[in-house]
Amino acid sequence: MLALIGRSGAGKSVLLRHLMGLVRPDKGRVLIEGVDLHRSSPSQRKALKERFGVLFQGGALFDSMTVFDNVAFPLREKSRLSEEEIRERVLKELALVELSGAEGKYPAEISGGMRKRVALARAIIHNPKIVFFDEPTTGLDPITARSIHQLIHSTHSRLRFTGVIVTHETWGLFSIVDRVALLHEGRILALGSPEQIMESREPVVREFLEPHRSFRSTAGQEAP
């Protein structure tokens, strides 16, 4: 999994929209599995996008639908499964994100952390090969954010998809990704393993990660 980090306004969300095929680049190409996303045929683009899963910023759940119907939505739109098969898969996925028993509730009736879990279940219900996570922990307290990161990690271990996480929050993130790219003013300023990024001497990288370093340093001290 790759984490795209950087300050607000660095270009993370714009890059994500390019990768998802929502924005056409002014120059350059977006290659996914060797296919040029913006120069391929409509049928090729459709087939490629059907392999995508997306956890949108804020969850983007349908307020008028129950948790069950939100998660079932991609299957009803993209698959030929029967309602019985859909029900079986949805309930299984909800159990895996620790939401058994919540299928009849509406988004307004559950917490922010639970809504993120519903959004994750919906993003992966059709077994995508590539999953895009847009600010998956924004608005959550540190403990809930960490639990979402761990849930993303366990889901990735189970399904083995390629994951791209866009975020400006690094708490608990570096323990679940393989590579990190830091964006600055629309360009990738640093790219490497979490360890390499943490040890970078690039001033912009060090400044961005200073709160993360301070937290780790404080957490590592023994209580008096």
Regions found by a protein language model. Give the residues of each.
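A short, proline-enriched helix->beta-strand linker immediately N-terminal to the Walker B motif
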Residues: 125-129
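Helix-to-loop junction immediately C-terminal to a conserved catalytic motif
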Residues: 20
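Conserved ABC ATPase "signature" region
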Residues: 35-36, 83-101
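Conserved ABC ATPase signature
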Residues: 106-110, 114
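Catalytic Walker B motif of ABC-type/P-loop ATPase nucleotide-binding domains
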Residues: 131-134
